[in-house]
Amino acid sequence: MNSVSTSAFGPVAFSLGLLLVLPAAFPAPVLPGEDSKDVAAPHSQPLTSSERIDKHIRYILDGISALRKETCNRSNMCESSKEALAENNLNLPKMAEKDGCFQSGFNEDTCLVKIITGLLEFEVYLEYLQNRFESSEEQARAVQMSTKALIQFLQKKAKNLDAITTPEPTTNASLLTKLQAQNQWLQDMTTHLILRSFKEFLQSSLRALRQM
């Protein structure tokens, strides 16, 4: 596998992000992607919970964009006409009308459950990405750890935790083994589809969370 060069979303951003998100869900005064003045600047209002979620998701999206750029630069997967076939073999989370996240039929509680459940389902795919970027593994790790922190924070906002579905560890382990056993072309295509789908899911989540 060709290695991927490290972009601006690299070691420094990763190290800072990892230190901030590991202890708990957003326990530190400064989140990844935030400047300290955004949190407690003199003579200014600190960011609200919603604003911090917004900024945190955009931080993750920046990381995804960097990884997608590297993926597209090293292969033609972003332009492949065969991606629909590969996508049929994946079960990537998507937003639907019944999830209550769209403007029409918006339901805050139902939508929040969908967002959290979807993020939990994406975790196995983010784990798969950890072995796909030799030189940019820190970027993939930062996206993964920042997503874990986002899940923890959103779970604290949810009113109906019992409605949140958590994937079975054995199912995830089996899926991960299956993905890693694919041939090189399918692994490259899977990487592209995961990044694209996760970006779309986060963008939809961000729009919905701004209504909450």
Curated annotation (Swiss-Prot):
GO annotation, cellular component aspect: extracellular space; interleukin-6 receptor complex
Biological process (GO), any one: response to activity
Keyword Glycoprotein in record: yes
GO MF annotations in UniProt: cytokine activity; growth factor activity; interleukin-6 receptor binding
Signal peptide (residue range): 1-27
Highest rank taxon of the organism: Eukaryota
UniProt keywords, alphabetically: Acute phase, Cytokine, Disulfide bond, Glycoprotein, Growth factor, Phosphoprotein, Secreted, Signal
Compartments reported by the entry: Secreted
SUPFAM superfamilies: 4-helical cytokines
Cysteine disulfide partners in this protein: 72-78, 101-111
Glycosylated residues in this chain: 73, 172
InterPro entries: 4_helix_cytokine-like_core, IL-6-like, IL-6/GCSF/MGF, IL6/GCSF/MGF_CS
Phosphoserine modified-residue sites: 81
Function field: Cytokine with a wide variety of biological functions in immunity, tissue regeneration, and metabolism. Binds to IL6R, then the complex associates to the signaling subunit IL6ST/gp130 to trigger the intracellular IL6-signaling pathway. The interaction with the membrane-bound IL6R and IL6ST stimulates 'classic signaling', whereas the binding of IL6 and soluble IL6R to IL6ST stimulates 'trans-signaling'. Alternatively, 'cluster signaling' occurs when membrane-bound IL6:IL6R complexes on transmitter cells activate IL6ST receptors on neighboring receiver cells.
Family: Belongs to the IL-6 superfamily.
Subunit structure as annotated in this protein's UniProt entry: Component of a hexamer of two molecules each of IL6, IL6R and IL6ST; first binds to IL6R to associate with the signaling subunit IL6ST. Interacts with IL6R (via the N-terminal ectodomain); this interaction may be affected by IL6R-binding with SORL1, hence decreasing IL6 cis signaling. Interacts with SORL1 (via the N-terminal ectodomain); this interaction leads to IL6 internalization and lysosomal degradation. May form a trimeric complex with the soluble SORL1 ectodomain and soluble IL6R receptor; this interaction might stabilize circulating IL6, hence promoting IL6 trans signaling.
Protein name per the record: Interleukin-6
Gene: IL6
